[in-house]
């Protein structure tokens, strides 16, 4: 039997005691299954624990079992496990933010809220579902939201990028509020350099390559050209905001296009291509008022795969940058030495998310 891809079997463990070793980490998580890998990340010079690590199980069911048994206490300390983000996804702003709300794109006219609930309830307890409609025409705008009572269902769902709902392909993303997107941008601004992934040709861009700036303004986080490395026009377009049913403000920009939908033309909409096209190739109007910014190309910031202990930054990266910074990424995995390093453009002192120090 072929083993599931590693990205579905790996957990990031934040908040580790500096006394926790790979042996104690392994002993704790082996109660839910067989581990194929276990590592505590350490400073390459001092060999001191950096306060986080990874465990990889033999199958995803074991990961589910472990996450269902939270909270986890190791060596007298409550740790914060989270499904690891794959390399190709970790380069995108907001990939590490912890949210309970899921964005669902590709919703067709014949798809109702009960279809969303029926499909996603197998992942966790759902608090609400919403399909966005045009206030004037009443027609569906092609996207919606599902809110869970926990972040783990969202993390699990986005690992599998495409889903089939009511017979139609749908794309899922974490739904980031405008404040969460602002936190992401503030992290970049306060870090003072390249975001720590890509090949830095864009000069401090979230996405590498010319014109791939993640820039904000009064109209949200749109603008600029998306870096077309497999995600032509992902982001870009004009900015704006969106209020959901609870009057929560969500940030802007067209949702962008992915390779399975064609080459996102015109306004950088979700898709492009004649079969989806309107407004210059944007899918359903390009998902105006949601998305946000240029998510850029693939990048090389890696919190998932290769544990390069010789690198001072969190995983190997071609830019030499660093994912840390003085501001929070909005997630629960904070401070200490999650992100600091000697990479170019890195200010250090920051964290993978959340609190400044444990």
Curated annotation (Swiss-Prot):
Q: Where is the composition biased (Gly residues)?
A: 193-217
Compartments in which it is found:
Nucleus
**Which keywords has UniProt assigned to this entry?**
Nucleus, Repeat, Ribonucleoprotein, RNA-binding
Spans annotated as Disordered? 182-217, 333-358
Q: What residues does the RRM domain cover?
A: 9-92, 100-179
Which Pfam families does this chain map to? HnRNPA1_LC (PF11627), RRM_1 (PF00076)
- According to the UniProt record, where is the region Nuclear targeting sequence? 309-352
Q: Which InterPro entries match?
A: HnRNPA1/A2_C, hnRNPA2B1_RRM1, Nucleotide-bd_a/b_plait_sf, RBD_domain_sf, RRM_dom
State the function annotated in the UniProt record.
Forms complexes (ribonucleosomes) with at least 20 other different hnRNP and heterogeneous nuclear RNA in the nucleus.
| SMART domains per the UniProt record, alphabetical | RRM (SM00360)
Single GO MF descriptor? single-stranded telomeric DNA binding
Name this protein carries in UniProt: Heterogeneous nuclear ribonucleoprotein A2 homolog 2
A single Gene Ontology CC annotation of this entry is:
catalytic step 2 spliceosome
Taxonomic source organism: Xenopus laevis (African clawed frog)
Under PANTHER family, the record lists: HETEROGENEOUS NUCLEAR RIBONUCLEOPROTEINS A2_B1 (PTHR48026:SF13), HOMOLOGOUS TO DROSOPHILA SQD (SQUID) PROTEIN (PTHR48026)
GO BP annotations, alphabetical order: mRNA splicing, via spliceosome; mRNA transport
């Amino acid at each position: 039997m072929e083993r599931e891809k590693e990205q579905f079997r790996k957990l990031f463990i934040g908040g580790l005691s500096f006394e926790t070793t790979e042996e104690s980490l392994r002993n704790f998580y082996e109660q839910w299954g067989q581990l194929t890998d276990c590592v505590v990340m350490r400073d390459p010079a001092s060999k001191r624990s950096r306060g986080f690590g990874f465990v990889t199980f033999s199958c995803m069911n074991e990961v589910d079992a472990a996450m269902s048994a939270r909270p986890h206490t190791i060596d007298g300390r409550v740790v914060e496990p989270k499904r690891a983000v794959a390399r190709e996804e970790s380069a995108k702003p907001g990939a590490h933010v912890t949210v309970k709300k899921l964005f669902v794109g590709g919703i067709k006219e014949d798809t109702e809220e009960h279809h969303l609930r029926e499909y996603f309830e197998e992942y966790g307890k759902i608090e609400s579902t919403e399909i966005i409609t045009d206030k004037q025409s009443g027609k569906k705008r092609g996207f919606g939201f599902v809110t869970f009572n926990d972040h783990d269902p969202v993390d699990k769902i986005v690992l599998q990028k495409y889903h089939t709902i009511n017979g139609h392909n749908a794309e899922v993303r974490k739904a980031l509020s405008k404040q969460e997107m602002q936190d992401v941008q503030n992290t970049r601004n306060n870090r003072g350099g390249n975001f720590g992934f890509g090949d830095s040709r864009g000069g401090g861009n979230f996405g590498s390559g010319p014109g791939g700036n993640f820039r904000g303004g009064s109209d949200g986080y749109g603008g600029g050209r998306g870096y077309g490395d497999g995600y032509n026009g992902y982001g870009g377009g004009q900015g704006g905001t969106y209020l959901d049913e609870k009057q929560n403000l969500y940030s802007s920009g067209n949702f962008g296009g992915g390779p399975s939908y064609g080459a996102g033309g015109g306004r950088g909409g979700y898709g492009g291509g004649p079969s989806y096209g309107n407004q210059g190739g944007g899918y359903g109007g390009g998902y105006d008022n949601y998305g946000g910014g240029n998510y850029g190309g693939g990048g090389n910031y890696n919190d998932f795969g290769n544990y390069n202990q010789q690198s001072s930054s969190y995983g190997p990266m071609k830019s030499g940058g660093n994912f840390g910074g003085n501001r929070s990424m909005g997630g629960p995995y904070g401070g200490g030495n999650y992100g600091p390093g000697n990479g170019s453009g890195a200010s250090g002192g920051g964290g993978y998310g959340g609190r400044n120090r444990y």
